[in-house]
């Protein structure tokens, strides 16, 4: 899987890849993440990428030329999709993550300041994605959420692909509770069913826990799950 990220702050993207699972996935060649800085495509000596909005208003707006030229400079693979990180986009979820994992290439546009000149949307025509109903200072953190989530779906990123299959939301439910050593800590014990080696009972227990946890913590997800049964 190849990710190409248009960002004014490449270091924010690359630094995330220097640790833990993402570093291993990168080093093993499971994923590659390239950063393209629109500032490198400006036409003036000051490398200006933003300007005041027509019609007035607060903040600075990202100019179309640097972003469109930077995007056009990205080599597009045949099986590719382009995303724009924006609070106006469709809410990102596990279903979308699974969809994106089927592509060879995901190109991501990260905004900053007051936002994009509307012509960037009109020319590039990206799929717009949001990670929630709140505003951040830039699109880099949302882009990293997408990269991290999608990478987990790709065989070779995790030690076992089953780890991703057991994640919360993979079947519409939250993940079951997990335990490790010691068996008892400060009076809190590991459920006995997890210690008896009966895999059928363990599977039933975990499914029951997933249902109860989803019902209590995310009744909206529980309702969707019930209606799909």
Q: Which residues are covered by each model-predicted region?
A:
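N-terminal nucleotide/polyanion-binding subdomain common to many enzyme families
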Residues: 1-74, 195-222
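Hydrophobic/aromatic beta-strand patches that form the interior of the parallel beta-sheet core
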Residues: 4-6, 34-36, 81-83, 106-107, ...
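Short, solvent-exposed amphipathic alpha-helical segments in soluble enzyme
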Residues: 20-24, 98-102, 123-124
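Short clusters of hydrophobic/aromatic residues that line enzyme substrate/ligand-binding pockets
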Residues: 49, 54, 92, 100, ...
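S-adenosyl-L-methionine/SAH cofactor-binding core of RNA-modifying enzymes
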Residues: 61-112, 117-118
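Charge-dense polyanion-binding interfaces
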Residues: 87-88, 168, 216-229
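Structured adenosyl-cofactor binding patch, chiefly the S-adenosyl-L-methionine
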Residues: 116, 120-167
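Internal, active-site/partner-interface "lid" segment
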Residues: 141, 153-192
